[in-house]
């Protein structure tokens, strides 16, 4: 749906994404931090003072694009639009996102989905405003951006219909960026999975499930959560991510391979008519 000129700039941005995986090449030195056992408040002050001096030392110096905004042990992943980079610390490269002993379906549905999710952030409603260098700069034709906005509005409208609790619904506008990344992430991970021998195997079953079924079950597994209703009401009003249930069901309900994998038919609870399904990337 994009013109050739906009599509080429999108491809250029995609290939320009910097990948930071595991841990930084240069470690930060904390020798100046004074830590004393039993002095919690004083230790916090020491850390804050060290951080202040660390940030102050950056003044009048070129931006260090090799710097990490998180620690290697943190279980997280993120896309930084200002650096056009995706970051995956060692903390997330473990179960349930990644497991050396697991089959491809499990890993592509786990860490594969997360990788695809962060890549898609480069082209969500916010990332789309940054160029390949991380500058806020328009690289769209007017017509293409209008098409993009129309597609994102369909995502907003769909997620507004998802019920969280009684009369509480997902806030489609608030969660647009993350929903775009969830849908794109699953699509990217699935396409990559289908390039593997296991992904092309439609016969072999493990624990009674086909490879495609295990792929989608792996996605569901990484978002397992148990929350109180009061917390969920607060979450829906403040968090830019959809509730875990809709981070799984929402994208799957728009994914044609999911319908085929589980033989989902009209009348089934999670069936979504084709004209209601959304796809941007």
Segments predicted by a language model, with ranges:
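Intrinsically disordered, low-complexity linker/terminal regions across diverse proteins
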Residues: 1-281
């Amino acid at each position: 749906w994009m013109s050739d000129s906009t599509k080429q700039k999108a491809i250029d941005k995609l290939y320009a994404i910097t990948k930071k995986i595991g841990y930084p090449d240069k470690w930060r030195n904390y020798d100046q931090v004074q830590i004393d056992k039993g002095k919690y408040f004083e230790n916090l002050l020491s850390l804050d003072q060290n951080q202040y001096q660390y940030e102050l030392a950056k003044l009048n110096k070129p931006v260090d694009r090799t710097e990490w905004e998180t620690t290697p042990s943190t279980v997280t992943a993120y896309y930084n639009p200002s650096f056009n980079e995706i970051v995956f610390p060692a903390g997330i490269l473990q179960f349930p996102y990644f497991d050396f002993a697991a089959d491809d379906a499990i890993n592509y549905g786990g860490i594969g989905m997360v990788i695809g999710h962060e890549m898609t952030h480069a082209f969500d409603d916010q990332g789309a405003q940054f160029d390949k260098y991380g500058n806020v700069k328009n690289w769209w034709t007017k017509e293409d951006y209008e098409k993009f906005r129309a597609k994102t509005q369909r995502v907003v409208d769909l997620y507004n219909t998802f019920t969280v609790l009684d009369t509480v619904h997902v806030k489609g506008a608030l969660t647009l960026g993350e929903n775009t990344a969830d849908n794109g992430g699953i699509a990217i991970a699935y396409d990559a999975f289908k390039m593997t021998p296991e992904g092309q195997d439609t016969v072999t079953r493990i624990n009674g499930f086909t490879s495609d079924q295990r792929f989608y079950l792996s996605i569901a597994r990484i978002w397992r959560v148990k929350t109180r209703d009061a917390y969920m009401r607060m979450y829906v009003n403040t968090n830019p991510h959809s509730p875990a249930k809709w981070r799984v069901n929402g994208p799957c309900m728009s994914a044609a391979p999911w319908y085929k994998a589980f033989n989902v038919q009209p009348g089934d609870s999670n069936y979504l008519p084709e004209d209601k399904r959304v796809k941007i990337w």
